[in-house]
Amino acid sequence: MIQMQTMLDVADNSGARKLCCIKVLGGSKRKYAGLGDIIICSVKEALPNSRVKKGDVVRAVIVRTAKEVPRPDGSAIRFDKNSAVVVNQAGEPIGTRIFGPVARELRAQRYMKIVSLAPEVL
């Protein structure tokens, strides 16, 4: 569950290291975002000579959340940290690699490029 002002780790090699959520997309009254949702973020930490700079406003797809997400079979998935992948306007990742596992829920929301780049899908 991600809301405004939530700090997220970045799970790709776009150059950003920390993001701060500034808007949850999907309606003016929407308060929370979950796995596979797109949010608008501000880059709080970035590597030098990277594609995204500190202070840039970017879109990101949430790939891991600390809040458990129930699944249809009765199980639930949760991760240690909140993480996101920086994407462009078309929803394609800016980076060329993804670090760490991603949730299976991304496949249902048609983020096939992110799922295929991930080393593990849980």
Swiss-Prot record:
Keywords assigned by UniProt? Ribonucleoprotein, Ribosomal protein, RNA-binding, rRNA-binding
Record-linked Gene3D superfamilies: Ribosomal protein L14
> Among the record's GO biological process terms, what is one?
translation
Q: Which GO terms describe its molecular function?
A: large ribosomal subunit rRNA binding; structural constituent of ribosome
Q: Look up the domain of life of the source.
A: Bacteria
Q: Which InterPro entries match?
A: Ribosomal_uL14, Ribosomal_uL14_bac-type, Ribosomal_uL14_CS, Ribosomal_uL14_sf
Q: Which GO terms describe its cellular component?
A: cytosolic large ribosomal subunit
What's the short name of a Pfam family annotated to this entry? Answer: Ribosomal_L14
Q: What HAMAP family does the record tag this protein with?
A: Ribosomal_uL14
Quaternary structure and partners: Part of the 50S ribosomal subunit. Forms a cluster with proteins L3 and L19. In the 70S ribosome, L14 and L19 interact and together make contacts with the 16S rRNA in bridges B5 and B8.
Protein family membership: Belongs to the universal ribosomal protein uL14 family.
PANTHER family per the UniProt record, alphabetical: 50S/60S RIBOSOMAL PROTEIN L14/L23, LARGE RIBOSOMAL SUBUNIT PROTEIN UL14M
Q: What is the recorded function of this protein according to its Swiss-Prot or TrEMBL entry?
A: Binds to 23S rRNA. Forms part of two intersubunit bridges in the 70S ribosome.
Q: What is this protein called?
A: Large ribosomal subunit protein uL14
Q: Which organism is it from?
A: Syntrophotalea carbinolica (strain DSM 2380 / NBRC 103641 / GraBd1)
